[in-house]
């Protein structure tokens, strides 16, 4: 699963997701992409599940790029713990995804295979997504 090798601070504030993605909104590496339509925290487990769903369907053909990285730690307190006594320990990592962000890209497969692979990947994610094609793609 994806996570940073080391971080400057173990715990971060939650923050809020305002507006649309400013960068990473167009297909850069492959010919096809999966774009987020809603804001969300995507966990490293969800990213990995989507990646596996795509690569299994594509059967080792083509290449997949993951354009998001989970660099935000999410803390949790143990169950049945009273309030107070500090912030919980980091439990998992999330990528902050805003609307318009391209999360996955693929190349080296036909448009039909890519469409189905991204549909399977989208089922593993907690947000609405959209299949996009590079403007200069000629299939």
Curated annotation (Swiss-Prot):
Keywords: Ribonucleoprotein, Ribosomal protein, RNA-binding, rRNA-binding, tRNA-binding. The keyword Lipoprotein does not apply. Belongs to the universal ribosomal protein uL16 family. Transmembrane segments: none annotated. Binds 23S rRNA and is also seen to make contacts with the A and possibly P site tRNAs. This is Large ribosomal subunit protein uL16. Pfam families: Ribosomal_L16. CDD domains: Ribosomal_L16_L10e. One of its GO terms (biological process) is translation. NCBIfam families: rplP_bact (TIGR01164). HAMAP family: Ribosomal_uL16. The keyword tRNA-binding applies. InterPro entries: Ribosomal_uL16 (IPR047873), Ribosomal_uL16_bact-type (IPR000114), Ribosomal_uL16_CS (IPR020798), Ribosomal_uL16_dom (IPR016180), Ribosomal_uL16_sf (IPR036920). It comes from the Bacteria.
